[in-house]
């Protein structure tokens, strides 16, 4: 599997350490093992997991700006775990409401020795962080409107929402509230993955402060 991963990384132009490659392979092996009992993903084949879960997560890495990130509706830790593995200098909170998913993430953290991942079992609207995040990641939400509504309290004043989508969602964008600004749209290239992938970056438009009229 390591040789297969090396080939995919080369196609994607992603350079990581040998230790990180080994950890990514371990992640796939654990996901494949746990999936048989806990049904964590509909992708059953480890080779397909490398493409649809690992590479599909890693291509987001170059667009992560800042130090603190939260992956909302992380499922079995996607994209949070692969991103944490190749970004040991960044901190990741992985949020999900299902205990079996959080238990899996805890096991991965233990077996891979990850020190930059914090799993949290909670519904997103009930999770209240003490400090806002530089980036709020999600590939779980069906609609942008839901993501931006339920996660509105999570980014810092300068933080961004980072939504992983398939096709460019023009119709959804037209329905977004006026206080949300699309900062950037990145078309992602995932080797051997059929269909389009986009990463959309949003920010809150901050109200003007300190203006008074007499």
Swiss-Prot record:
Keywords: Cytoplasm, Methyltransferase, rRNA processing, S-adenosyl-L-methionine, Transferase. One of its GO terms (molecular function) is rRNA (guanine-N7-)-methyltransferase activity. It holds the Pfam family GidB. It catalyses: guanosine(527) in 16S rRNA + S-adenosyl-L-methionine = N(7)-methylguanosine(527) in 16S rRNA + S-adenosyl-L-homocysteine. It is found in: Cytoplasm. Disulfide bonds: none annotated. Its EC number is 2.1.1.170. It is an enzyme of class 2 (transferase). Its main location: cytoplasm. S-adenosyl-L-methionine binds at residues 73, 78, 124-125, 139. It comes from the Bacteria. The keyword rRNA processing applies. One of its GO terms (cellular component) is cytosol. The keyword rRNA processing applies. InterPro entries: rRNA_ssu_MeTfrase_G, SAM-dependent_MTases_sf. Signal peptide: none annotated. PANTHER family: S-ADENOSYL-L-METHIONINE-DEPENDENT METHYLTRANSFERASES SUPERFAMILY PROTEIN. Belongs to the methyltransferase superfamily. RNA methyltransferase RsmG family. This is Ribosomal RNA small subunit methyltransferase G. It comes from Aeromonas hydrophila subsp. hydrophila (strain ATCC 7966 / DSM 30187 / BCRC 13018 / CCUG 14551 / JCM 1027 / KCTC 2358 / NCIMB 9240 / NCTC 8049).
């Amino acid at each position: 599997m390591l040789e297969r991963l090396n080939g995919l990384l080369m196609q994607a132009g992603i350079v990581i350490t040998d230790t990180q490659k080994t950890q990514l392979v371990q992640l796939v092996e654990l996901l494949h093992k746990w999936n048989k009992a806990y049904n964590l993903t509909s992708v059953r084949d480890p080779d397909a997991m490398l493409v649809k879960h690992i590479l599909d997560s890693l291509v987001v890495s170059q667009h992560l700006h800042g130090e603190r990130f939260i992956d909302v509706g992380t499922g079995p830790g996607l994209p949070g775990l692969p991103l944490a593995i190749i970004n040991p200098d960044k901190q990741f909170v992985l949020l999900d409401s299902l205990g079996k998913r959080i238990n899996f993430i805890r096991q991965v953290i233990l077996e891979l020795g990850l020190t930059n991942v914090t799993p949290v079992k909670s519904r997103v609207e009930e999770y209240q962080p003490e400090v806002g995040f530089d980036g709020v990641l999600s590939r779980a939400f069906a609609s942008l409107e839901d993501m931006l509504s339920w996660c509105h309290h999570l980014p810092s004043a300068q933080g961004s929402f980072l939504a992983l989508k398939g096709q460019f969602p023009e119709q959804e964008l037209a329905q977004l509230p006026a206080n949300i600004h699309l900062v950037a749209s990145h078309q992602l290239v995932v080797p051997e993955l059929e269909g389009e992938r986009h990463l959309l970056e949003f920010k809150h438009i901050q109200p003007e402060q300190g203006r008074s009229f007499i």
